Design a protein with these regions (language model features):
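Membrane-embedded alpha-helices and immediately adjacent juxtamembrane helical segments
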Residues: 1-303
Length: 303
């Protein structure tokens, strides 16, 4: 009941003052050094994503055909890193071919590096939702174990997506006869594969908004944030694809570093949209509670 009252109050304010709410979100994002936080998240995501994918593929290859795993990985990495999924998948495939060389020390080191992005993301969320941290802090053991639990959940998600995607691909090879005309299901299969990826994006973003901030966030708030961030990213992704395929000369400027630069740039934009969505949710909570607008700049304690 209390959440509904807060939601009604926030919705009424936003409908009455949409521009003021938008400006307040932008001010809060700037005061919290949102772009700086996004840069940190993107940098550690770049360090984490390759070892994480390698570990996931090696683990799941015991249950699912590795070739099918790599095809699914390449398709849905394209949603995260436009134009660069092939090179990342090639590195993962090369690691998979040499998986017998993996030792416990190497596996543990890769697992440790894979957790960096989630740890930094949790810290960034604590800056955005500073009003929650001031009330309740998360136990350090929970913070330490959270990245690994989240990686396990993502690994299970990759397995489920691979199974469903494989089923849809098989369906795409079939056809139906309707009113004497044969209709191929290839187009339907392609559309469903894209929607599966979009639904996965929304689910992952929603889970981040639910899990990473301290305290319990309303599911409806997290879902709205997840849908908004996913749709904004889809728009940004199409712009990136168009830019890199028509206007960009990044390969001329950076040469062999092109892949890393493009991936970093894509992750930077994605992290910015992710944290901006979190700022929208934080501002929505503030408006719902009827608190005055306060966005003091983020500062650090003196040495």
């Amino acid at each position: 009941m209390r959440v509904r009252i807060l939601n009604r109050r926030a919705n009424a304010y936003i409908l009455k003052h949409p521009l003021a709410f938008t400006l307040s979100v932008l001010k809060g994002f700037r005061a919290n050094q949102g772009l700086l936080l996004a840069g940190a998240v993107a940098y550690y995501a770049l360090l984490s994503i390759v070892p994480f994918l390698m570990l996931v593929v090696v683990a799941l290859s015991h249950f699912i055909d590795p070739a099918e795993l790599l095809v699914t990985l390449r398709r849905y990495l394209e949603l995260l890193m436009p134009g660069q999924s092939a090179s990342i998948t090639a590195e993962v495939a090369n690691f998979l071919d040499n998986r017998e060389l993996i030792t416990w020390v190497l596996g543990g080191t890769m697992l440790f590096f894979s957790s960096f992005a989630f740890t930094v993301l949790e810290n960034a969320m604590s800056v955005i939702f500073v009003h929650r941290v001031a009330i309740r802090r998360r136990h350090f053991l929970v913070s330490a174990l959270l990245p690994y639990c989240y990686m396990l959940a993502l690994g299970i998600g990759v397995m489920l997506v691979t199974v469903v995607a494989g089923t849809l691909q098989v369906m795409g090879k079939e056809s139906v006869i309707l009113l004497g005309t044969t209709w191929s299901l290839g187009g339907v299969s392609g559309a469903l594969l894209y929607l599966l990826g979009l639904a996965g994006e929304i689910l992952v973003l929603t889970s981040i908004y639910l899990v990473m901030p301290v305290g319990r966030l309303s599911t409806s708030h997290a879902l709205v944030g997840g849908v908004t961030a996913a749709l904004l990213w889809e728009a940004a992704r199409h712009v990136l694809v168009w830019y890199f395929s028509t206007l960009s000369q990044v390969n001329v400027v950076y040469g062999s570093m092109t892949t890393a630069i493009v991936v970093m740039f894509s992750l930077e934009i994605g992290a910015t949209l992710l944290l901006f969505g979190a700022q929208v949710i934080a501002e929505y909570e503030r408006v719902g509670r009827g608190k005055p607008e306060r966005h003091p700049p983020m500062t650090t304690a003196p040495a």
